């Protein structure tokens, strides 16, 4: 396979995200696990259950990518979800951390040759290298970790090393996360930490690297961490956001979250 992306930084960020989550959960009792997460329909334990089942499923994809075997069929997922849903909040929390630790340890054990040769077909149609698969996993894990962290500390942010990687995946994610806006507007987006320049089209819900000839009618300046949370439907604090020609509520309606 050509154009393989080095997965080292993704593996490191996945480890950091897991360790951060483990630290958050370590201080929670039964009431804390049953408390609401940022998602109004999920408790903290529900988030952990989701991440635990996700770790099991991604482990199946990891095995397929390393061995060259077939990826898991969709019908393999339902028994995993049902098993997690049947567990108590305490068991969901403990098992979630255990299965994700096992996933991270497996990733860390892969040789450079195994990482470079990794190839798997996701969802039956999308070929991915290891960095691509970890991009999917990190976006899920880092944002859901924030869903828990922000309920414990309202000033919590998405982990910086995850931000550095995930900001460049926003063009890939926009179509999945966005809701097309009939009143389309082109927005020049500039971010800090790290610095990036994008053009956001709310009509087709696309994000692309800014071009030299782009002349958007609106502009948005904000930290990259806040832009990620905007795209993932999690931007409630707009103190560091400067918008012109478009409002933050209008942009939030384009990205309702998951």
Mark where each language-model region is.
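Short, helix-capping/interhelical loops that line the mouth of catalytic, cofactor-
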Residues: 1-9, 56-109, 113-118
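Surface-exposed helix-capping loop/turn segments at secondary-structure junctions
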Residues: 27-33, 108-115, 150, 154
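Phosphate-handling catalytic interfaces
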Residues: 117-120, 222
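C-terminal interaction segments
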Residues: 212-258
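Short, contiguous alpha-helical
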Residues: 32-74, 120-178, 227
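Glycine/small-residue-rich hydrophobic helix-like segments
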Residues: 180-224
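An N-terminal domain-cap segment
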Residues: 2-49, 59
């Amino acid at each position: 396979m050509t154009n393989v992306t080095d997965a080292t930084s993704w593996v490191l960020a996945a480890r950091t995200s897991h360790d951060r989550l483990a630290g958050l959960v370590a201080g929670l009792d039964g009431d804390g696990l049953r408390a609401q997460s940022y998602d109004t329909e999920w408790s903290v334990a529900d988030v952990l259950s989701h991440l635990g089942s996700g770790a099991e499923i991604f482990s199946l994809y990891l095995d397929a990518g390393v061995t060259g075997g077939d990826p898991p069929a969709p019908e393999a997922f339902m028994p995993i979800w049902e098993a997690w849903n049947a567990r108590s909040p305490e068991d969901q929390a403990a098992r979630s951390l255990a299965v994700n630790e096992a996933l991270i340890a497996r990733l860390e054990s892969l040789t450079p040759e195994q990482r470079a040769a990794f190839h798997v077909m996701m969802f039956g149609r999308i070929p991915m290298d290891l960095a691509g698969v970890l991009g999917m996993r990190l976006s899920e894990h880092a944002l859901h970790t924030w869903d828990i962290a922000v309920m414990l500390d309202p000033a919590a942010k998405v982990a910086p090393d995850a931000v550095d990687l995930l900001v460049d995946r926003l063009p890939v994610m926009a179509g999945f996360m966005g809701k097309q806006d009939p009143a389309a507007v082109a927005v020049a987006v500039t971010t800090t930490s790290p610095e990036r320049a994008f053009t956001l089209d709310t009509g087709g819900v696309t994000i692309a690297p800014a071009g030299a000839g782009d002349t958007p009618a609106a502009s948005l300046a904000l930290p990259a961490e806040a832009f990620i949370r905007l795209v993932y439907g999690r931007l409630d604090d707009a103190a560091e956001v400067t918008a012109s020609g478009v409002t933050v509520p209008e942009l939030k309606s384009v990205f309702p979250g998951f």
